[in-house]
Amino acid sequence: MLFRSAIHGGIYRARPEVNAVVHNHSTALIPFGVTGMPLRAIFHMGAVIGSEVPIWDSRPEFGDTNLLVTDHEKGRSLAAALGARRAALMRGHGSVVVGATLPIALGRTIYLDHNARLQAQALQLADDPDEVVYLDDEEVQALSWQAYARSWELWQTQWKPRLAAEAALRPIPPSA
């Protein structure tokens, strides 16, 4: 698909150490991408998102668009906004998350979503946004080494039956 290849291709060209890119449309992330509220690590597993999650906005560079990364120029622009970071929000669209392996990229994606939900809840509870306590850079560095071997096995166990059930509902294409 052109859209995914532009996103993934731009990042793979810019980041040779990346072997997995996850693009998603998490509704928990959209508010952070459209308000400019920084998405910051708020709990121990949130450290996997790193110290900064930039927001890529296509409008300044490309004018009014449909918010989709439809060509390689936009893919390169998104990759530049991501830089050396682990994730980037896409204004009004979703996010991209990267990793050296699929389990790492998927783990970061899941915990990015969890972190966004927790941060939004904390901001709602706080009388003043400055009352919310985030992880500092040292805590992020101390925690971000976490691997996903155990989580990956659990996610596979949980998702394989669901994916198999969905596959069973799809019609089998006729033989040529």
Q: Where do the protein language model's features map onto the residues?
A:
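Glycine-rich flexible loops
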Residues: 1-176
